[in-house]
């Protein structure tokens, strides 16, 4: 999957993609995260970081730029087949993960 995504990104950008950040479900354990990172290396990618999908959603939404003083934020990531939440402390553009959890048996398809 990562190799195919790399090929799509290379074609879309018109240049080789090497450095990547990969998102994973919040419930992934350390061995699943390492396997994802290893798959990235096999696909010829330099995996800079593995981050939880709820954290990626917070960054994409721009919370790092909208928060002026330290705030605790609860992020819901209601995917098609999973439900992830993270509690983040955000200050000066820095995200500190306080807690994260997920449920593989509850997601958007269940609603």
UniProtKB/Swiss-Prot annotation:
<keyword id="KW-0346">Stress response</keyword>
<dbReference type="InterPro" id="IPR013126">
    <property type="entry name" value="Hsp_70_fam"/>
</dbReference>
<keyword id="KW-0547">Nucleotide-binding</keyword>
<keyword id="KW-0067">ATP-binding</keyword>
<dbReference type="GO" id="GO:0140662">
    <property type="term" value="F:ATP-dependent protein folding chaperone"/>
</dbReference>
<protein>
    <recommendedName>
        <fullName>Heat shock 70 kDa protein</fullName>
    </recommendedName>
</protein>
<dbReference type="GO" id="GO:0005524">
    <property type="term" value="F:ATP binding"/>
</dbReference>
<dbReference type="InterPro" id="IPR018181">
    <property type="entry name" value="Heat_shock_70_CS"/>
</dbReference>
<comment type="similarity">
    <text>Belongs to the heat shock protein 70 family.</text>
</comment>
<dbReference type="Pfam" id="PF00012">
    <property type="entry name" value="HSP70"/>
</dbReference>
<dbReference type="InterPro" id="IPR043129">
    <property type="entry name" value="ATPase_NBD"/>
</dbReference>
């Amino acid at each position: 999957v990562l190799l195919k995504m790399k090929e799509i990104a290379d074609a879309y950008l018109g240049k080789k993609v090497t450095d990547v950040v990969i998102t994973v479900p919040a419930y992934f354990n350390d061995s699943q995260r390492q396997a994802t990172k290893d798959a990235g290396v096999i696909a010829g990618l330099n995996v800079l970081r593995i981050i939880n999908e709820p954290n990626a959603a917070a960054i994409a939404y721009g919370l790092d730029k909208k928060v002026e003083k330290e705030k605790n934020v609860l992020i819901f990531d209601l995917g098609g087949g999973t439900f992830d939440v993270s509690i983040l402390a955000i200050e000066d553009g820095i995200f500190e993960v306080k807690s994260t959890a997920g449920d593989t048996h509850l997601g958007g398809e269940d609603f």
